[in-house]
């Protein structure tokens, strides 16, 4: 069948972006709105939810997506205000250092709830609406490069992100008969407000040494991949994790030597 340029558009489709008040989530929400979607932002910080919703002309809901009751309430409100949801982006997440020998049970649970539990809750609830309405749709989860490589000091976070990747594959198979596609995005270094707040001076240049494309990513580049996965142009893609990382995952430890610029592997 011939390609139709309008297939990239999301006109009048209802999209939910969790954790859409800042960073990658806000970039995706902004991108969806630019391509015609009606966007609902589910965000546990009320002020950023409101600000992001105003920017994209959408609906901002103060929601803790780790809580099933709040997810149910947010979904009911979204459907009532905007209509049935056909796009979901599970973007909410969090990370802190958690060395294996020092991680408490509470710490492990916190990282699980922040990075995996909400993916299960939101995917299940939104998919039920899609199935009941017979509308199909696209579900996209934001995982991380840490989901496919070792992450010393971040075992709990990496395990949760790996769980997102496998859950994506399994959910894709279970939901395929209903016309629901399930995919994931795996960023690496992406310039967000949070990264810029904690990064030392000159970090941008150092980040560039580890990325084959020579620079960190931008939230709008994550949004571009999300728009593609949400749109009709990706109608035969499901169960996949796309690494939007400038080539870092493919590099497998190769990096630009800071003095010569030549690719090197490990210490030199």
For the regions a language model picked out, list residue spans one by one:
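Substrate-binding pocket helix/loop in short-chain dehydrogenase/reductase
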Residues: 99-100, 107-112, 207
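Active-site loop immediately N-terminal to the catalytic Tyr-X3-Lys motif
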Residues: 101, 149-155, 177, 214, ...
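C-terminal helical subdomain
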Residues: 105, 184, 205-237, 244-246, ...
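Alpha-helical segment proximal to the catalytic Tyr-Lys
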Residues: 128, 173-177, 235
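Residue(s) in the substrate-gating loop at a strand-loop-helix junction
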Residues: 144
């Amino acid at each position: 069948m011939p390609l139709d340029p309008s297939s990239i558009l999301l006109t009048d489709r209802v999209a939910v972006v969790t954790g859409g008040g800042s960073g990658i989530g806000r970039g995706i929400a902004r991108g969806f709105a630019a391509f015609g979607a009606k966007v609902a932002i589910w965000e546990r910080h009320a002020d950023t939810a409101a600000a992001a919703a105003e920017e994209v002309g959408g609906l901002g809901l103060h929601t803790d997506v780790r809580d099933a009751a709040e997810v149910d309430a947010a979904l009911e409100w979204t459907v009532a205000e905007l209509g049935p949801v056909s796009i979901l982006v599970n973007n909410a997440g969090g990370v802190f250092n958690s060395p294996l020998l020092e991680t408490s049970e509470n710490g492990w649970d916190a990282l699980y709830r922040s990075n995996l539990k909400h993916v299960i809750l939101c995917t299940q609830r939104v998919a039920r609406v899609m199935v009941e309405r017979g509308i199909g749709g696209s579900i996209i989860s934001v995982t991380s490069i840490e989901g496919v490589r070792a992450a010393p000091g971040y075992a709990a976070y990496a395990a949760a992100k790996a769980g997102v990747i496998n859950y994506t594959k399994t959910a894709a198979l279970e939901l395929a008969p209903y016309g629901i596609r399930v995919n994931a995005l795996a960023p690496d270094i992406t310039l967000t407000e949070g990264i810029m707040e904690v990064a030392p001076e000159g970090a941008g240049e150092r980040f560039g040494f580890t990325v084959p494309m020579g620079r960190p990513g931008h939230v709008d580049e994550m949004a571009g991949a999300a728009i593609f996965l949400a749109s009709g142009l990706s109608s035969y893609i499901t169960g996949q994790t796309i690494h939007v990382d400038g080539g870092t995952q493919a590099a497998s430890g190769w990096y630009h030597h800071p003095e010569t610029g030549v690719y090197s592997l490990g210490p030199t």
